[in-house]
UniProtKB/Swiss-Prot annotation:
InterPro entries: MeTrfase_F, MeTrfase_F_su. Signal peptide: none annotated. Keywords: Cell membrane, Membrane, Methanogenesis, Methyltransferase, One-carbon metabolism, Transferase, Translocase, Transmembrane, Transmembrane helix. It catalyses: 5-methyl-5,6,7,8-tetrahydromethanopterin + coenzyme M + 2 Na(+)(in) = 5,6,7,8-tetrahydromethanopterin + methyl-coenzyme M + 2 Na(+)(out). This is Tetrahydromethanopterin S-methyltransferase subunit F. GO terms for cellular component: plasma membrane. It comes from Methanosarcina acetivorans (strain ATCC 35395 / DSM 2834 / JCM 12185 / C2A). It comes from the Archaea.
Length: 74
């Protein structure tokens, strides 16, 4: 049995794997993870300021519907 060195080829090299599909999948996962993170940040911001926004809107509506017409003499 002859060795690889006898044929002048040396140690066989490992072929480079096809990384195109793997890279595309990794980028897709990374993009989706960023979208989910942004959405969670937005949701938490809205939820934390929801009561304050509701109260401000309610007071503004009272001002526009009740107080301003009374001041105008309607």
């Amino acid at each position: 049995m002859r060795m690889a060195e006898e044929y002048g080829k040396g140690v066989p090299m490992v072929l480079n794997p096809q990384m195109g599909a793997i890279d595309a999948t990794v980028e897709s996962i990374r993009y989706r993870a960023q979208l989910i993170a942004r959405n969670q940040k937005l949701d938490s911001g809205v939820m934390s300021t929801g009561i304050i926004g509701f109260a401000a809107g309610f007071l503004f509506s009272l001002l526009m519907v009740i107080i301003l017409p009374l001041m105008a003499g309607l």
